[in-house]
Amino acid sequence: LKLEAGDRLGLIGHNGSGKTTLLRALSGAYEPDEGSIEVEGRITALLDLSLGIDPTATGIDNIRLRGRIAGLSSRDIEAKMDEIATFTGLGPFLAMPLKTYSAGMQARLAFAAATAVEADVLLMDEWIAVGDAEFQKLAHKRLLKLVERAGILVLATHEAPLLKLYCNKVMKLDGGVA
């Protein structure tokens, strides 16, 4: 598999076909059984929005934690803080521990923090739709901008219409084999 700038690869296959495993290998979370993976540039992996979320920490502290997990410096995180906080729409709740948030509020925070990065290579396990209808519209626009700015997109999905909209290449996986 070789991808170059401008490539938009859609991964399709049944549950358990290897889509998420491939994304995790591309992200560096898994070592390949054979061969090697070489990636140039910053990888942003939107595989698990809840990764790194601490229910006992405040919303603000969770934004900082997610930023560090994404490889951002403290200065970069603080520079993005106002934008992320505003996007969440959570206002004073950001000073409260996440365990006091509803599931929708937690999803807003996790999505805003996870998508506040730049990506040379963007890995997505399904198209993300979080929150209520109004927030989903905002989230969709934000995701589109992230996808447009990414040099390379690898999107795992079950939805053929998404492949047609966003991908210029498709790889069908079955049992971990293309």
Provide a role label for each language-model segment.
Residues 115-124:
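A short, proline-enriched helix->beta-strand linker immediately N-terminal to the Walker B motif
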Residues 136-149:
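Helical segment within the ABC ATPase nucleotide-binding domain
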Residues 5-10, 14-68:
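ABC ATPase nucleotide-binding domain signature region
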Residues 64, 76-93:
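Conserved ABC ATPase "signature" region
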Residues 157-158:
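H-loop/switch region of ABC-family ATPase nucleotide-binding domains
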Residues 126-127, 131:
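Walker B catalytic motif
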Residues 97-101:
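Conserved ABC ATPase signature
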Residues 166, 170-178:
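H-loop (His-switch) and adjacent beta-strand-loop-beta switch element
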